[in-house]
UniProtKB/Swiss-Prot annotation:
Keywords from the named record: Acetylation, ATP-binding, Cardiomyopathy, Disease variant, Ligase, Nucleotide-binding
The protein's name in its UniProt record: Phosphopantothenate--cysteine ligase
Enzyme class: ligase
Annotated EC: 6.3.2.51
GO molecular function, one term: ATP binding
Keyword Nucleotide-binding: yes
Lineage, top ranks: Eukaryota, Metazoa, Chordata, Craniata, Vertebrata
Gene: PPCS
Subunit-structure text: Homodimer.
Biological process annotations from GO: acetyl-CoA biosynthetic process; coenzyme A biosynthetic process; heart process
Catalytic activity: (R)-4'-phosphopantothenate + L-cysteine + ATP = N-[(R)-4-phosphopantothenoyl]-L-cysteine + AMP + diphosphate + H(+); (R)-4'-phosphopantothenate + L-cysteine + CTP = N-[(R)-4-phosphopantothenoyl]-L-cysteine + CMP + diphosphate + H(+)
One of the Pfam families matching this protein, by short name: DFP
Annotated source species: Homo sapiens (Human)
GO terms under cellular component: cytoplasm; cytosol; nucleus
Disease cited in the entry: Cardiomyopathy, dilated, 2C: A form of dilated cardiomyopathy, a disorder characterized by ventricular dilation and impaired systolic function, resulting in congestive heart failure and arrhythmia. Patients are at risk of premature death. CMD2C is an autosomal recessive form with variable severity and age of onset ranging from 2 to 20 years. Death in infancy or early childhood may occur in severely affected children.
Amino acid sequence: MAEMDPVAEFPQPPGAARWAEVMARFAARLGAQGRRVVLVTSGGTKVPLEARPVRFLDNFSSGRRGATSAEAFLAAGYGVLFLYRARSAFPYAHRFPPQTWLSALRPSGPALSGLLSLEAEENALPGFAEALRSYQEAAAAGTFLAVEFTTLADYLHLLQAAAQALNPLGPSAMFYLAAAVSDFYVPVSEMPEHKIQSSGGPLQITMKMVPKLLSPLVKDWAPKAFIISFKLETDPAIVINRARKALEIYQHQVVVANILESRQSFVFIVTKDSETKLLLSEEEIEKGVEIEEKIVDNLQSRHTAFIGDRN
């Protein structure tokens, strides 16, 4: 008996079929070039509480780790499919908050032929020229595709479509699942149609568990791919055991495990038979090295070995 599709009960987002085609073409083109492709998921999902939603429960995530990791994967030669929360951190752009543009840029002359010329002091936007060049190179090469989600339902459907797009690449596909996905949701059939009124007194909500898509991803959607999940804890004493438990349950390849307070300076790369601590030194922090550079470098080496074992 065929297993039920775990995303079927969630409403399909507008444009999902079109995005599925775009992602499939992106993956097929890069696969034909012999290029590895990574899906980077980034940012948090939100869950509506009403059918015509006004109120939501939101899993907050800035998306910085996903955006910075996407940059590192592009620098390493991967094609990057970036599935991210709308208005969360975007590769390269996240380094330059909007408010800095207002003080850093100024018109350099009258607009000609509909073009506005701007200039900025180099020290007002440090690193901007390099970031712009890197982004434009990826865009010109067609190695970067960004796809937005907002709600949990958006994310689940687009993740499934992305997996189906990358599945034909076999072990050359990587999944880097850094998004902060909601654990609970209200089924559409149980949502009130209109805005929940505060005049009704204290609110009680019964929520269902979100299906763990790591299992169908590993078993059915992309069974030959190299798959990395993330585990964030606040207690250092349990983080490795929790990571190993996830590997045992889902049978994927790697868990990136980290502690809330130190997640930007060290992580553990955990596999079924090893654990590796990646740590930024004080000197590296002063030089602006980011932990995501070390994570991606480590995973790239593991991905190479993974591909070699299957060829």
